[in-house]
Amino acid sequence: EGTRVLAVVADRRSARFFDVGLFGAAELDGVAAPESSRGGRFHSAQRTGPRQGGGHAAPGSGEYRFQNRIREEKERHLARVAESAQARLRSGYDFLVVGGIGVEADALVAHLHPSVRDRFVGALQLAPKKVTPAEIQVRAMELVADHAQRSAEAAVEEFRERLPARWAVDGVESTLGALARGQVRTLLVDHDARVPGYRCGTSGRLSESLALCRGEGEPMPIADLLDDAIEDALRQRANVAVVRGAPARRFDRLAAILRFQMAR
């Protein structure tokens, strides 16, 4: 629910920025190109007649220079937009979505620094001057949901590959034990599962079994261990994959890919 998305919708002259969340989107300050060639089109009549020093300009040379200047202005503008996006991403955004008409969105992605590309989840075909915050919110969150599902399915595949070599654990109690030891790199959670349990009093670890908390202080009942396991994993800077549908049936409610191999 706390997911924040920075959405950038750009053309060659301007860019609009939106702060997007699950329940809405707010428009932020935009970026405008300071030196756009607002004449718009090349007029060949501007290039007729002799050039300085005698002779005539080569046919089409004026139009070539004009188009080249347009391309250079566009590249400088997109670089400024990308720089602004990168600075704003430091303000706690989880993901980045870009939009534009035609190839503009892909052109903007090319200017992003590699350090922020892992937060880029997709590009949208949008008219920068017409798009509304409501449309941005719906389209951006659809991209985020698709990205999350693809990432979760990839995590399940990696889990299945690593399980035989003890680089992963399956099942609630085994996974909670790995989490208590700080072993979890990626936590896999079945979206539709609910597991009541306990948080042991002195150790603070989670367990499905009251008996397993014996000797660790007064246990605290937990309505759903999976929610608390997600919070513990995030505090340990582990990745969390909430898995929906058929892929969730490939593990037992809770599983983990480990930071280091389990001992025999």
Predicted regions and their residues:
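Terminal alpha-helical anchor/extension segments at protein ends
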Residues: 1-264
